[in-house]
Amino acid sequence: RCHFVVCTTDCRRNSPGTYGECVKKEKGKECVCKS
């Protein structure tokens, strides 16, 4: 499972102030940024 903390960290690295949301991709799960 994609953890929220991991998503948040990834999003902050690219876009500070955003939160991460886990979405299902063909290869496992991937984190995307949501404002």
Curated annotation (Swiss-Prot):
It is found in: Secreted. Expressed by the venom gland. It comes from the Eukaryota. Blocks Kv1.6/KCNA6 potassium channels. Signal peptide: none annotated. Belongs to the short scorpion toxin superfamily. Potassium channel inhibitor family. InterPro entries: Toxin_32 (IPR012636). This is Tamulustoxin. Keywords: Disulfide bond, Ion channel impairing toxin, Neurotoxin, Potassium channel impairing toxin, Secreted, Toxin, Voltage-gated potassium channel impairing toxin. GO terms for molecular function: potassium channel inhibitor activity; toxin activity. Pfam families: Toxin_32 (PF08120). It comes from Hottentotta tamulus. One of its GO terms (cellular component) is extracellular region. Disulfide bonds join 2-22, 7-31, 11-33.
